[in-house]
């Protein structure tokens, strides 16, 4: 989209958004209760034909199963994904651990806590965003054996590209910095993985932020560190 393309050449002070990005990035820390232990089949923007075709087939099958099991629809999920993006951003800026515990998976929350606790006393962060849109890139289903000898539970993971205009500001504790402004918001294009348990009581949460779309495009080039082979 235009917003995603605009983020590739933005040359503003990126410290605030990089601080937020580090807090949002989750690295799986082993099997956690009530979630999958890792991201299933990490999505990359540029894939070979065979892998792309296989991925499409897997997503189509997973979509049909989600529709029958939880009444999943693409429009309603995209709306929820956009809202969750905003809710996580606001809770992260406020260092609201209680809200984050409801919005992200346990492993994702554990990865956020060091950055939140390292903030200087008296420092304030703020996050505002608008025009948030989410596009689905991949859907996967997997099982996880729960701790305590419980039966396996099924989970869904949906990878989305999230496009948003946002402003992230830091003030207090001797520092003032911002990414974007109300007049010229920063165009952010992120790739998020959302996860939920199927069945009763399941809700979508952030599993992991994979990075910006431009970062993933660079690492998935044929000569890059990612794989672009089929």
Where are these regions (language model features)?
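Juxtamembrane and targeting peptides
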Residues: 1-92, 228-230
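Structured, amphipathic secondary-structure segments that form assembly/contact surfaces
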Residues: 90, 98-224
């Amino acid at each position: 989209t235009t917003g995603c393309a605009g983020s590739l050449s933005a040359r503003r002070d990126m410290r605030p958004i990089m601080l937020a990005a580090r807090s949002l990035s989750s690295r799986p820390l082993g099997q956690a209760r009530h979630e999958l232990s890792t991201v299933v089949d990490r999505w990359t923007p540029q894939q070979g034909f065979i892998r792309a075709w296989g991925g499409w087939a897997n997503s189509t099958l997973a979509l049909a199963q989600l529709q029958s099991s939880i009444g999943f629809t693409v429009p309603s999920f995209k709306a929820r994904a956009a809202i969750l993006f905003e809710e996580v951003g606001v809770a992260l800026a406020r260092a609201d651990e209680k809200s984050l515990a409801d919005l992200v998976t346990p492993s994702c929350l554990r990865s956020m806590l060091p950055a939140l606790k390292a903030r200087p006393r008296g420092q304030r962060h703020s996050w505002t965003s608008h025009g948030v849109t989410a596009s689905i890139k991949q859907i996967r289903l997997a099982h996880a054996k729960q701790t305590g000898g419980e039966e396996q539970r099924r989970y869904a993971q949906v990878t989305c590209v999230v496009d948003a205009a946002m402003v992230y500001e830091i003030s207090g504790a001797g520092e003032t910095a911002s990414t974007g402004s109300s007049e010229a918001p920063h165009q952010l294009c992120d790739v998020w993985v959302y996860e939920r348990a199927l069945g009763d009581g399941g809700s979508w949460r952030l599993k992991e932020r994979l990075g910006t779309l431009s970062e993933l495009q660079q690492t998935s080039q044929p000569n890059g560190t990612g794989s672009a082979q089929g």
